[in-house]
């Protein structure tokens, strides 16, 4: 292993010169350069340059190194064409990856290793005012470049602030600023034959809110892997075509640049050992043709200001936990559930933390145009299991055997307590082997080496002979798993027979190796293997899982349960106006089914600009003069969600008051008008139209039909009541609603059903459900003559109902004495009570 580091120390301001305040720059070239310095140190001192280092690939090759780690707390520059291939690992830590000043504009950088780590360094805040540190915290350079950066491996990890190209400033001794700029790359490509993982950076919010890791370039970027995903509870983003930040939630992109995601290998990779991560993909143009996952987490594509988002044929965009079985914290006393030492906070249905937050779990597709092409899959289905294990110290044992080596008896009969240095503890889990151990905030006794695996022969009951990836020891309680202790006290070369031990464990021989490298121990090590059932006899655990604890907690509080892995998630379409009828097209596969005991998934459509939304029949263009987002009804219906919501997002605060479903505010405030145009039909188990400020309109000839579409998501039978200001809902479920007064006395534009917005008009407006039909508004309600409806439960919630004959109501209106609300005549009352028996 060769490790080189070029650091940037702190200097006292009043005792520093500009000579030492140079940007730290480590230059990597294909061949090393001979030194031009004088032979003696004294003679060379005056010509030495601070903060500068250089390494040639030929030097690395000549040294026979399989592992290379380079750290520059500043710039890591490539001097022209560079091709570097390492036998085991390549780790690059830097403030920016860029070309050197002298490199050709069309330079090509090719890096490869079985394991590749790209890690960014974020400079910490300077220690008080009297210190200065020569670190440039810049953004990508916009200087012209035709350079190519290609990196490949069997596993690629990205951690921290990884920036290609740099433009920033350094503070000088006189407090002035010196500009520092290095060119980036026209195209960056990362190719992993296995996974491409995003690991946690220095802090949760160091790059943006909730984001600790990013890949950032001003040019095009292509990521190819068996699958991309963030680690457990990691917030990460990938940005291509970066120009500058507009706000904390929006970026100005180069309209000519593209972020492309591709797939390597055959077949679908198994769901990774990860939960509750967040991954944002941002560029003017995004082509998602690979496998992007964030199990039980959040994926955002185009939500930072994209022009066009395409989910390509064969792609998978998934936040489903189906197939995932993962150790995730636990509870000792049944009162508090903790992960990594912190109390776990549960989310209510809707997956928003509060009124002003955005979606925390689900998928967000944003931009002016979102196209889901044939055979592209968006998976928000329910599934997955988070296992709990809270160690109970007491009669079951005073130490947790997952973290402590077993006591041994020496040759003289004395007790020996090995340390983790000689006797590290891991776990192995039968089944499909991931090849590399997962990385998570809550680790095991010892972190396995990257790709570390063990080959075991036959003879241990319940464990087939084979090669297994060494996992963190917290996995030892998983179904079928084994605790693995490498008995370093026995030394190497142990080839003894597999035999049982008196404590229920087994002793056997195993050979350590590193995946995808050909590196392995030539001699075996003694292993102590302990099945999960036997491990439970060594130490006592409360194995209440995440979902089991959440259900018990809700029962204790007397409120509806929080969101669980079995629940399907929400797909938010965060669209911007400007694409006409091409704003959204869905021809792919939508998975919104819940696992057993779960709630179905939701599609929520929002116009992030004016808020105005219109839904037109298939093949129709945007309405002339309409200022908003135009959607094709067939595309909305084709997704197959249990709930279709236009205008807003639902919010449930778990805990006190957790019975009420409201609509989110902030960037998700329901605003503008929601219009269902003539000829358009919305069909789902339940359909909601909401607007706090605009009107809800169903034109004559438009319809909403939930008959035969299946079970709705959670409803009144699950303990929920909707509390909104202006909503039209057609549902196969049972809906309870109450009116919500808006802040500042604001009112909506009301609800109009069966109106003729532009003559000529034809057809009937139809509203049919197998459950509930709700019209709740704080303003006028209009029911046209051509409206037909059928439902089991009709609920009209209005601030005012004006009852009288047509003549009396007309006279009151003429005298400006008729308040906004519903005008109820005898004829209208008869219609409401009669309903429609033509359908269902």
Task: Tell me the role of every PLM-derived stretch.
Residues 1-840:
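Extracellular and secretory-pathway beta-repeat/beta-biased strand scaffolds
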């Amino acid at each position: 292993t060769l490790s080189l580091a070029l650091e940037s120390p702190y200097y006292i301001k009043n005792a520093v010169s500009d000579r030492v305040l140079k940007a730290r720059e480590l230059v990597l070239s294909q061949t090393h350069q001979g030194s031009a310095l004088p032979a003696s140190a004294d003679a060379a001192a005056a010509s030495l340059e601070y903060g500068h280092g250089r390494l040639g690939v030929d030097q690395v090759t000549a040294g026979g190194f399989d592992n290379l780690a380079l750290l520059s707390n500043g710039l890591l520059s490539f001097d022209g064409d560079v091709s570097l291939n390492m036998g085991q690992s390549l780790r690059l830590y830097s403030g920016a990856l860029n070309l050197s000043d002298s490199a050709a504009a069309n330079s090509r950088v090719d890096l490869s290793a079985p394991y590749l780590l790209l890690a960014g360094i974020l400079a910490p805040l300077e220690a008080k005012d009297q210190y200065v540190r020569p670190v440039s915290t810049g953004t990508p350079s916009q200087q012209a470049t035709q350079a190519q950066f290609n990196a490949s491996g069997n596993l690629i990890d990205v951690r921290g602030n990884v920036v290609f190209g740099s433009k920033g400033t350094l503070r000088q001794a006189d407090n002035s600023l010196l500009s520092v700029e290095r060119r980036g790359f026209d195209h960056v490509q990362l190719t992993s034959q296995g996974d491409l993982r995003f690991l946690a950076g220095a802090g949760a919010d160091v790059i943006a809110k909730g984001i600790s890791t990013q890949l950032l370039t001003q040019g095009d970027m292509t990521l190819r892997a068996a699958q991309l995903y963030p680690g457990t509870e990691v917030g990460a983003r990938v940005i291509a075509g970066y120009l500058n930040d507009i706000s904390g939630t929006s970026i100005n992109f180069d309209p000519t640049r593209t972020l492309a995601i591709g797939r390597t290998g055959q077949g679908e990779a198994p769901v990774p050992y990860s939960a509750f991560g967040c991954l944002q993909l941002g560029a003017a143009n995004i082509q998602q043709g690979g496998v992007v996952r964030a199990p039980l987490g959040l994926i955002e594509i185009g939500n930072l200001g994209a022009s066009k988002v395409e989910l390509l044929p064969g792609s998978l965009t998934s936040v489903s936990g189906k197939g995932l079985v993962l150790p995730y914290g636990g509870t000792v006393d049944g009162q508090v559930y903790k992960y990594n030492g912190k109390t776990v906070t549960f989310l209510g249905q809707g997956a928003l933390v509060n009124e002003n937050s955005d979606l925390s779990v689900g998928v967000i597709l944003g931009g002016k145009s979102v196209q889901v092409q044939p055979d592209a899959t968006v998976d928000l289905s329910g599934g997955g299991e988070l296992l709990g294990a809270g160690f109970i110290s007491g009669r079951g044992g005073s130490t947790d055997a997952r973290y402590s080596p077993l006591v041994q008896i020496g040759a003289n009969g004395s007790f020996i307590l090995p340390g983790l240095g000689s006797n590290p503890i891991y776990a192995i889990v039968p089944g499909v082997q991931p090849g590399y151990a997962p990385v998570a905030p809550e680790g095991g006794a010892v972190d396995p080496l990257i790709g570390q695996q063990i080959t075991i022969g036959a003879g241990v009951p319940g464990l087939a002979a084979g090669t297994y990836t060494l996992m963190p020891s917290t996995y030892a309680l998983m179904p079928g798993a084994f605790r693995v202790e490498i008995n370093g006290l026995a030394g190497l070369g142990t080839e003894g027979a597999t035999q049982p031990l008196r404590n229920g464990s087994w002793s056997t021989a195993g050979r350590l190796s590193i995946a995808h490298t050909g590196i392995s121990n030539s001699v075996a090590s003694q292993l102590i293997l302990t099945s999960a059932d036997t491990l439970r006899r060594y130490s006592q655990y409360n194995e209440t899982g995440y979902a089991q604890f959440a259900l018990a907690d809700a029962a204790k509080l007397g409120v509806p349960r929080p969101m669980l892995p079995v629940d399907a998630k929400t797909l938010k379409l965060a669209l911007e106006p400007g694409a006409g009828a091409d704003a959204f097209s869905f021809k792919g596969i939508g998975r919104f089914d819940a696992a057993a005991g779960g709630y179905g998934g939701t599609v929520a459509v929002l116009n992030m600009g004016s808020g105005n939304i219109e839904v037109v029949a298939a093949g129709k263009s945007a309405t002339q003069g309409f200022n908003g987002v135009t959607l094709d009804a067939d595309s909305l219906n084709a997704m197959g969600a249990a709930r279709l919501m236009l205008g807003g997002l639902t919010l449930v605060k778990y805990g006190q008051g957790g019975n009420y479903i409201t609509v989110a505010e902030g960037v998700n405030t329901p605003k503008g008008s929601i219009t269902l145009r003539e000829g358009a039909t919305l069909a789902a188990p339940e359909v909601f139209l909401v607007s706090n400020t605009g009107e809800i309109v169903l034109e004559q000839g438009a319809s909403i039909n939930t008959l035969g579409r299946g079970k709705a998501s959670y409803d009144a039978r699950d303990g929920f009541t909707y509390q909104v200001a202006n909503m039209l809902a057609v549902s196969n479920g049972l809906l309870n609603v109450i009116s919500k007064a808006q802040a500042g006395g604001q009112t909506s534009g009301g609800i109009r059903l069966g109106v003729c917005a532009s003559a000529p008009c034809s057809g009937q407006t139809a509203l049919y459900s197998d459950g509930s039909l709700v019209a709740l508004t704080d303003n006028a309600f209009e029911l046209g003559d051509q409206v037909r409806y059928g439902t089991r439960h009709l609920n009209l919630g209005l601030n005012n109902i004006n009852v009288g004959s047509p003549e009396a109501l007309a006279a009151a209106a003429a005298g400006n004495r008729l308040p906004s609300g519903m005008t109820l005549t005898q004829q209208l009352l008869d219609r409401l009570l009669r309903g429609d028996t033509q359908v269902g």
